[in-house]
From Swiss-Prot:
An example Gene Ontology CC term for this record: cytosol
Keyword Transit peptide: no
Membrane as UniProt keyword: no
This protein's encoding gene: rimP
Identification of the protein by name: Ribosome maturation factor RimP
GO biological process: ribosomal small subunit assembly; translation
HAMAP family reported for this sequence: RimP
Subcellular location: Cytoplasm
Main location class: cytoplasm
Superkingdom: Bacteria
InterPro entries: Ribosome_maturation_RimP (IPR003728), RimP_C (IPR028998), RimP_C_sf (IPR036847), RimP_N (IPR028989), RimP_N_sf (IPR035956)
Protein family (similarity comment): Belongs to the RimP family.
């Protein structure tokens, strides 16, 4: 986490805690000629537009007071979306029993992607039901995990 991301995280936590929101992620990056500070939040039942506005206004005021960013940037506060990557233990716990897609750094059985039902997460390992059998993946070899969205 960069210094700017850490400052934004520290500044936004009071409003999140007050409203029982979860901080999913903070990212500060340049896209094209613009810098973006993005804050992704969530809560039980899902985040609303009003929730995002509340957090955005609060964080904008705090950032103006501290002024940690020397150049212009765009502040965005949003929900992480349905297909957000699973990163924290809580993300995995919420998705037990659901279909996930796992991408690997190093292939297993000549494959780098697996899809199956998440049946267990231990912190070090992800265990899915893949083609009717338990399959374990070491987190050190996992590059990305995200839910499978079916409509």
């Amino acid at each position: 986490m960069s210094k700017i991301e850490q400052i934004a995280k520290d500044l936004v936590m009071p409003i999140l805690e007050k409203n029982n929101f979860e901080l999913v992620d903070v990212e500060y990056k340049k896209e094209g000629s613009h810098w973006y500070l993005r804050v992704y939040i969530d809560k039980e039942g899902g985040i609303t537009l009003d929730d995002c506005q509340l957090v955005s206004e609060y964080l904008s005021d705090r950032l103006d007071e501290v002024d940690p960013i020397e150049h212009s940037y765009i502040l965005e506060v949003s929900s992480p979306g349905l297909d957000r990557p699973l990163k924290k233990p809580r993300d995995f716990e919420r998705n037990i029993g659901k279909e996930i897609e796992i991408s690997l750094y190093t292939p297993i059985d000549k494959r780098k992607k697996f899809e199956g039902e998440l049946i267990e997460f231990t912190g070090d390992k992800i265990i899915i039901l893949y083609n009717g059998e338990r399959k374990e993946f070491d987190m050190k070899n996992v590059s990305l995990v995200k839910p499978v969205i079916k409509f």
